[in-house]
Structures are given as structure tokens and as C-alpha cells.
Amino acid sequence: MESAPPLGGKARSAQGAPVADLAVPLGPMPLHLVVMGVSGCGKTLIGSAVAQVLGLPFIEGDELHPPRNVALMAAGTPLTDADRADWLATIAARLGSAQAAGQGLVVSCSALKRSYRDVLRGSCPGLRLVHLHGSAALLHQRMLARTGHYMPASLLASQLATLEPPAADEDAISVDIGLPPDPVAATVLARLQATAR
């Protein structure tokens, strides 16, 4: 794991390109961050880049789905709340364990509904959220361009229908994905810095 850049140093993305001039750390307490949004929004790409810049571990939430969920999604079957329950509990436990150990953590997780996010916050008070969003056309295009992922583009419509964007009282950072990844990551980092607590 790379260390965070020095105060005022040049932050770099996972690809090594500069993304921000960032003063770190982002506050007195370790950062616990969920990068959320529907499939195709870039949760893994942006989340891993932010984690690398900040010198924090990153967990790909999709890798924590039980095999049954993966099989359902691969077959084009949308997950229900019940299907997601154990998965969300696993992610919540990872966040809670990191917080208890005083270790920051960045996780990618669709977290489509407020009730799902409440589960995560229940195990990790003070959890920060970054909501990546974009047009349905752009999301669909990105899903079609992906290789090696079990989530078919046909499930995008159900995810968009399920999505409950974070409300004002959830204190989420909302970022449009219309720009290339580096500017998106830079925006996330700058807004995390501006709202550090």
C-alpha cells in the first residue's frame, strides 16, 4: 500500500496521472468512505484511485457477493432486498472492523437504497458517501464496453429504478461522471478535503 502524499503534494491516480493538489490527512479521524452508484458509474476505478492517493486500503464490494447473487445477476435477474441483506452485512462488518481498529477504508458498493446505506452507517458511524452518477446512455455505453464482469447491461434499468439518490441529510458528495476518470477523482478528493470533519 502506498503512503499518502506529503502535505500539499501532488496526488496521483491509480494510473499515475496527477489528479489533485491535496493536503492530507482529510481530518482528525480515519476516513471511512463508500463510493456508491449504479453499475457502470466507475465505483471501482474512482474508489481505488482515491484510496491509493490517500494511502488507504480499498475493497471491491462486488467481490463480496455470495455465489448465489453472482449467478442471479449473471443470468440477468435483479437482486431483491433479501438477496442483498447478507452482502450488505458483510460490507458493514468490514467497515465496522476498520473503524474499531482505527484504520481508514474505502469501499465500492452500489448502496442503491437509503435503507442499504443505513445498514452500513449502523456499523460505521460517520461513514462518508460519494455518489457517482451519470446519464442512462453513458452508463449503458460503459457497461457494454466492460469485459470480464458478470453484471449484464440489461440490469441497468432495474438498478436505476431502484436507486434512491442520497438525501441532503446523508451528507453525501455527488459527482457527475461525464468527465474522464482523473478529473472525476480530482473532484472527489477536493470535495472530501473541503468537507473534512
What are these language model-derived features?
Residues 1-31:
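Extreme N-terminal, non-catalytic leader segments
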Residues 35:
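Hydrophobic anchor at the beta1->P-loop junction of P-loop NTPases
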Residues 38:
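P-loop (Walker A) phosphate-binding loop of NTP-binding proteins
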Residues 43:
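Conserved lysine of the Walker
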Residues 48, 52-90:
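Conserved substrate/cofactor phosphate-moiety recognition/catalytic segment
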Residues 82-124, 132:
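Glycine-rich phosphate-binding loop used to anchor ATP phosphates in small-molecule kinases
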Residues 124-143:
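Conserved phosphate-donor/acceptor-positioning beta-strand/loop module used by diverse small-molecule
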Residues 145-187:
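Small-molecule kinase domains that catalyze NTP-dependent phosphoryl transfer to phosphate-bearing small molecules
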